[in-house]
């Protein structure tokens, strides 16, 4: 039985909801951190974590399944070449949701969704002066 396996409706039609989640998955895979509302973040976690688990085993069938769900070649390449090997030893829990307070316009709860082991792109530069 599949009782209780549905996603939140998020006040959208099914086509709009699936397209929105697909776009959010692609953005998260590309940028490794995105800002969205808390209910969308919780739904995004439910769809992106199985994709990363799929990418841990790089077979042609898994690539085709990932492309069927993502519909973006660059995201599939990054998923299988970068994220799959990075999370190979981790048994799940690839994303982190951080609450960010409330949005100014409509007071919606906001959240930051990020991949757990993401490489810090902007490292703090050290101000060491060489004495010449």
Swiss-Prot record:
Q: Name one GO molecular function term.
A: structural constituent of ribosome
Does the record bear Nucleotidyltransferase in its keywords? no
Give a Gene Ontology cellular component term annotated to this protein. Answer: cytosolic large ribosomal subunit
Q: Which terms are listed as keywords in the entry?
A: Ribonucleoprotein, Ribosomal protein
Entry's InterPro entries?
Answer: Ribosomal_bL17 (IPR000456), Ribosomal_bL17_CS (IPR047859), Ribosomal_bL17_sf (IPR036373)
Oligomeric form and interacting partners:
Part of the 50S ribosomal subunit. Contacts protein L32.
What is stated as this protein's family in its record? Belongs to the bacterial ribosomal protein bL17 family.
Protein name, UniProt field: Large ribosomal subunit protein bL17
The organism of origin for this protein: Albidiferax ferrireducens (strain ATCC BAA-621 / DSM 15236 / T118)
Its encoding gene is what? rplQ
């Amino acid at each position: 039985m599949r009782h209780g396996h549905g996603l939140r409706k998020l006040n959208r039609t099914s086509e709009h909801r699936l397209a929105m989640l697909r776009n959010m998955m692609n953005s998260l895979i590309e940028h490794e951190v995105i800002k969205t509302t808390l209910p969308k973040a919780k739904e995004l976690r439910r769809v992106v974590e199985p994709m990363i688990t799929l990418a841990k085993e790089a077979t042609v069938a898994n690539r085709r399944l990932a492309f069927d769900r993502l519909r973006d070649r660059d995201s599939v390449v990054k998923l299988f070449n970068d994220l799959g090997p990075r999370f190979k030893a981790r048994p799940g829990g690839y994303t982190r949701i951080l609450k960010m307070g409330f949005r100014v316009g409509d007071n919606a709860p906001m959240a930051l969704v990020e991949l757990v082991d993401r490489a810090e792109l902007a490292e703090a530069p050290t101000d060491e002066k060489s004495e010449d």
